[in-house]
Amino acid sequence: MYDPKSLKAEEFICHEEIEDTLKYADENKDNLPLIREILDKARLCKGLSHREASVLLACEDPEILDEIYKLANEIKHKFYGNRIVMFAPLYLSNYCVNGCTYCPYHRQNHHIPRRKLTQEDVAKEVIALQDMGHKRLAIEAGEDPVNNPIEYILDCIKTIYSIQHKNGAIRRVNVNIAATTVENYRKLKEAGIGTYILFQETYHKESYEKLHPTGPKHNYAYHTEAMDRAMEGGIDDVGLGVLYGLEMYRYEFCGQLMHAEHLEAVHGVGPHTISVPRLKKADDIDPTKFDNGISDETFAKICALIRIAVPYTGMIISTRESQKVREQVINLGVSQISGASRTSVGGYAEEERPTDTEQFDVSDQRSLDEVVRWLMETDHIPSFCTACYREGRTGDRFMSLCKSGQIQNCCHPNALITLKEFLEDYASPETKAIGEKMIAQELENIPNEKTRSIAKGYVEKVAHGERDFRF
């Protein structure tokens, strides 16, 4: 029985409810009065239920699709303005005991070299990332209790935060590791992590168990209930994601929204972020062998509807996607992107060797400077801000500020201050020239006179060598 307040995976992600929802969506995909009613509700920026959003996803009317895209862009700007938060993944270890059939790190893949970074290696990677200009990382590691125990992860986090090379500093470490215990989540909280990220991969239980035939990840309930344990362990911000291409996209979309509704119902706080990765080629993984791949057009529609249905969430897209796709979905709701990513262990400090393994092939291979310049040329502010985490604006406090729109009073000036840091320390002359012009224009767009004056003062101080100012 479907119950969003239940702590049992098969009740808050109820297969029968998803099937009923998809049937309802099919029956109403051409019901224009209902669709207009749903769109009118969406314009209130309070979100949509999984059933309402599924009707919009099923609708194929071109005029409605145009309206969905326009509304997604409006909602994104209402909550996040024209800012795009920058981050990079940092792969610590590709040792893994699981048998995931879509990931090259699976245990049966014997021809890839296995590698685990030492703390000295971690420091080298962090320096390389700082020298690009990154301030925010998402650490990644395979599940292996012998090679990658929680103590190893904690040591890596400590090392990352300790490195300050020249003017560089990693100010926020997000963590994407396997589902674990409440006790271990408490340890991650104490280590000062930002968001705990865990991709569900697929919400379809039967498919999930086939795709994860061996290893601890085979346990669907333990994996699906991980966010509840994380929040019980004190982690304020959690990030959801499915791997589109493993199962029918409409099923996954519905399940993802049900998970968000569950977190809101039980904990009073929905997902801080939602990621939208698609299955991509990697080492011994051929995505064409999976039957549920989605087109760029469908992918864009999913992104737009996630923004409409969960307006407060940060939406993340990685370098799995091409520059063309990233540019489209940034205008449909995506608010965070990775830049200059390396998806192999040790990929930043060393030249990638042909024998190195990547978790997935990188489609957007531009440098961080090139990505920053591209964003500004498309009228977006690249933001390296991490202030909310360090000012305690997390969990329900962040959500209340975000839902009310007040978060922009902090985020807009903070984005400009951190962009100024990037321009002073890491940018090419061409990028710096474009950025200086953008900062001057955007400072004048800060509505509060006092905030605008303080922000201008901080930007001037950064120009004279001082760092790390924030609202």
Label the model's feature ranges.
Residues 107-123, 128-230, 236-246, 268-275, ...:
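Core AdoMet radical
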Residues 40, 44-84:
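An N-cap/entry alpha-helix motif that binds or orients negatively charged groups
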Residues 211-217, 288-292, 357:
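Short glycine-enriched, charge-decorated loop/helix-capping segments at active-site entrances
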Residues 1-37, 41, 327-335, 341-471:
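Radical SAM enzyme core and accessory elements
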Residues 141, 195, 200, 221-285, ...:
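Conserved C-terminal portion of the radical SAM core fold
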Residues 88, 126, 154-161, 185, ...:
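Generic structural signal for well-ordered alpha-helices
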Residues 80-121:
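Canonical Radical SAM [4Fe-4S] cluster-binding loop centered on the CxxxCxxC motif
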